Regions:
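Conserved small/polar residues in nucleotide/adenosyl-binding loops
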Residues: 147-151
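C-terminal alpha-helix
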Residues: 140-144
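A glycine-centered loop/beta-turn motif at secondary-structure junctions
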Residues: 106-128, 136-137
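Catalytic beta-strand/loop cores that center a nucleophilic Ser/Cys/Thr
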Residues: 65-113
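Cysteine-nucleophile active-site neighborhood
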Residues: 1-53, 59, 68
């Protein structure tokens, strides 16, 4: 069901914000692959499965220049929380990376051919109360969605 819904939303050029499984779904549906188990297949050097609670940061990501994430935050790094065992392995051809963890995992992506299709591997919805930067991610999505709705 989710892949069919995503296909419809992308064809309709509606704003998309994919979080955790959402970034993974975006990547898989657009032709990318996933690590099914980071510890077995990738051997991370960052904490990607922090213990609860998830309202604090566990590692930083490096933000790629000339990307929507850089435009939203206007900084080079961001501290993020992390609680996943799957992640992007091979990036889908249509997606562009916006941030990487220090051990090289893609942590944020966007689809440049669409108005607003963004994915984050971390959980900004769990940390935004303690981090204005994560709140900015939602404010940006709401602003774009509102503009899209009014068009």
């Amino acid at each position: 069901m989710e892949p069919k819904l995503l296909k419809y939303v992308l064809e309709a050029n509606k704003p998309v914000l994919g979080i955790c499984r959402g970034i993974q779904l975006l990547n898989a549906c657009l032709g990318g692959t996933l690590y099914q188990d980071l510890d077995q297949q990738f051997h991370p050097t960052c904490i990607h499965r922090q213990p609860a609670p998830y309202d604090h940061s566990s590692h930083q990501v490096k933000i790629v220049e000339n990307t929507p994430l850089k435009d939203i935050l206007n900084q080079e790094t961001l501290m993020v929380n992390s609680c996943h065992h799957q992640a992007i392995c091979q990036l889908a051809p249509a997606l562009k990376p916006m941030a990487y963890s220090d051990d090289g995992l893609v942590e944020a992506v966007y689809l440049p051919d669409k108005k607003y299709v963004i994915g984050y591997q971390w959980h900004p919805e769990m940390i935004y109360k303690k981090s204005d930067n994560h709140l900015k991610l939602f404010k940006d999505f709401v602003a774009v969605s509102y503009t899209h709705l009014r068009a």
